[in-house]
Amino acid sequence: LMCNLLEGVVNSGTGVRLRYKYKLTNPMGGKTGTTQQHADGWFIGVTPDLVGGVWVGAEDRSIHFQNLANGQGANMALPIWAKFLQKAYADSGLKMSGRPFDRPAGISKRLDCDETISEAEAKEMNKSLREDEEEFY
């Protein structure tokens, strides 16, 4: 379930730049982060073969980026992760598979919304999902 949540960050959230700007198409997830007063930006990335993180900031807490746009993890740390991941996938010696995340046994998909919404409302909500997209809860 956690991998599914983190994939959402990369497929349609603050990490989507990995897909369109850096052309990374393999299964992956991530989480961006920014600290108070734009002092740190970070990105944690996960693939089925690799987990890593990038932190951009300073140990001296009085040093910080001038504005949120510069201090965001999606703007400062994510590009570093993207370049690293591009090189990792290009290196055949690392054997990065590009396989999907493993789905643990015992996880099932249940679409049981009738206690909170009508069947017509559920069908209308499902129209917004791409045909190949599934959400797990």
Model-found features: residue ranges?
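Extended acidic low-complexity intrinsically disordered regions
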Residues: M125-Y137
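A penicillin-recognizing enzyme superfamily signal
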Residues: L1-K127
